[in-house]
Amino acid sequence: MSASAVFILDVKGKPLISRNYKGDVAMSEIDHFMPLLMQREEEGALTPLLSHGRVHFLWIKYSNLYLVATTLKNANASLVYSFLYKIVEVFSEYFKELEEESIRDNFVIVYELLDELMDFGFPQTTDSKILQEYITQQGNKLETGKSRVPPTVTNAVSWRSEGIKYKKNEVFIDVIESVNLLVNANGSVLLSEIVGSIKLKVFLSGMPELRLGLNDRVLFELTGRSKNKSVELEDVKFHQCVRLSRFDNDRTISFIPPDGDFELMSYRLSTQVKPLIWIESVIEKFSHSRVEIMVKAKGQFKKQSVANGVEISVPVPSDADSPRFKTSVGSAKYVPEKNTVIWSIKSFPGGKEYLMRAHFGLPSVEKEEVEGRPPIGVKFEIPYFTVSGIQVRYMKIIEKSGYQALPWVRYITQSGDYQLRTS
């Protein structure tokens, strides 16, 4: 059968949950599914199999959900569809009614079920009675027969070796959020997205258990049950070391960590976030022989925060020459091989506004108008700040020898794909 990944989408085609089984198809390919489906529907040629390039989407609709399997190969379609309907059957037995709300309210147990239902693209355990023997309604594993031996005794913690020793026991926690933004030439935000991750550097002796607590606001949002006006974290993924059943029960992120660097958790936030650095640009032409570009940058984040290493890349015509610059802060340089002016600002406080003017000789303005202009790109990094408001409340480190360890937390918001189109 060989399915590469399985997605569950809401009625608008937005991914609620997904499981990548083989890694040979980019998870972003699912973005093409809904536009394809709507196009075929309008043409009156809708089929249960849709294709985009080499990627095939095999899908069914149930209630207000789309279940989609992706594959590169000429898979056995009847088996794939049989498996998708089996997912519906199993989930319906677990959650009584299979709909968007039941997926959002039970995302941890859904992940566990998807892990058991399929392995490397092939159906594994699809009998709901067998699944219910060790995946309970609360997401706990039932203990059958003899009591279980702790994983550390059997060395079942494959991601961590025994006998690790450090003179100084420390844990460094980085909460990093990247801002993806696309603004059109009229100033309207076309895309606004936050991609976040919690990364750890672990220097701990022995076989410690760590418990990480996040602020309550975020925990409620992770469950999908928040009634208050709040942002919602999506596509939440945990490292394999996290005890999902424990998290599902009391929202505690409990784990025995790998040694060194690893990503504990990742998430996405799709919401209209106010652009942190706003750019306005004006182009003035003079006698078809020179052009003046004026760029205004404004920090639209808290005044007590500072953006570091700001780089604003402004496209210029390919035949521009004789550059001259004037900046209210920072420095500007012309990079002819990229047809770009890079305006660098070492430190950009929130609420501040700065100006840069660039003058170029321009022998052929008309040519540039036909070609159009690439967008302005912005790079930045803001420490001690997250857009989502996620915060680490505590980190408990438990190890049988009873040593004291120091946890350090750092928050960083940085630019991802941050572009503003120009007219």
Swiss-Prot record:
<dbReference type="GO" id="GO:0006886">
    <property type="term" value="P:intracellular protein transport"/>
</dbReference>
<dbReference type="InterPro" id="IPR001392">
    <property type="entry name" value="Clathrin_mu"/>
</dbReference>
<keyword id="KW-0653">Protein transport</keyword>
<dbReference type="GO" id="GO:0030665">
    <property type="term" value="C:clathrin-coated vesicle membrane"/>
</dbReference>
<dbReference type="GO" id="GO:0030131">
    <property type="term" value="C:clathrin adaptor complex"/>
</dbReference>
<dbReference type="InterPro" id="IPR036168">
    <property type="entry name" value="AP2_Mu_C_sf"/>
</dbReference>
<dbReference type="Pfam" id="PF01217">
    <property type="entry name" value="Clat_adaptor_s"/>
</dbReference>
<comment type="function">
    <text>Subunit of clathrin-associated adaptor protein complex 1 that plays a role in protein sorting in the trans-Golgi network (TGN) and endosomes. The AP complexes mediate the recruitment of clathrin to membranes and the recognition of sorting signals within the cytosolic tails of transmembrane cargo molecules.</text>
</comment>
<dbReference type="InterPro" id="IPR011012">
    <property type="entry name" value="Longin-like_dom_sf"/>
</dbReference>
<protein>
    <recommendedName>
        <fullName>AP-1 complex subunit mu-2</fullName>
    </recommendedName>
</protein>
<dbReference type="GO" id="GO:0016192">
    <property type="term" value="P:vesicle-mediated transport"/>
</dbReference>
<dbReference type="InterPro" id="IPR050431">
    <property type="entry name" value="Adaptor_comp_med_subunit"/>
</dbReference>
<dbReference type="InterPro" id="IPR028565">
    <property type="entry name" value="MHD"/>
</dbReference>
<dbReference type="GO" id="GO:0030136">
    <property type="term" value="C:clathrin-coated vesicle"/>
</dbReference>
<dbReference type="Pfam" id="PF00928">
    <property type="entry name" value="Adap_comp_sub"/>
</dbReference>
<keyword id="KW-0968">Cytoplasmic vesicle</keyword>
<dbReference type="GO" id="GO:0005794">
    <property type="term" value="C:Golgi apparatus"/>
</dbReference>
<dbReference type="InterPro" id="IPR018240">
    <property type="entry name" value="Clathrin_mu_CS"/>
</dbReference>
<comment type="subunit">
    <text>Adaptor protein complex 1 (AP-1) is a heterotetramer composed of two large adaptins (gamma-type subunit AP1G1 and beta-type subunit AP1B1), a medium adaptin (mu-type subunit AP1M1 or AP1M2) and a small adaptin (sigma-type subunit AP1S1 or AP1S2 or AP1S3). Interacts with P2X4.</text>
</comment>
<keyword id="KW-0472">Membrane</keyword>
<keyword id="KW-0813">Transport</keyword>
<keyword id="KW-0333">Golgi apparatus</keyword>
<dbReference type="GO" id="GO:0035615">
    <property type="term" value="F:clathrin adaptor activity"/>
</dbReference>
<feature type="domain" description="MHD">
    <location>
        <begin position="168"/>
        <end position="421"/>
    </location>
</feature>
<dbReference type="InterPro" id="IPR022775">
    <property type="entry name" value="AP_mu_sigma_su"/>
</dbReference>
<keyword id="KW-0597">Phosphoprotein</keyword>
<comment type="similarity">
    <text>Belongs to the adaptor complexes medium subunit family.</text>
</comment>
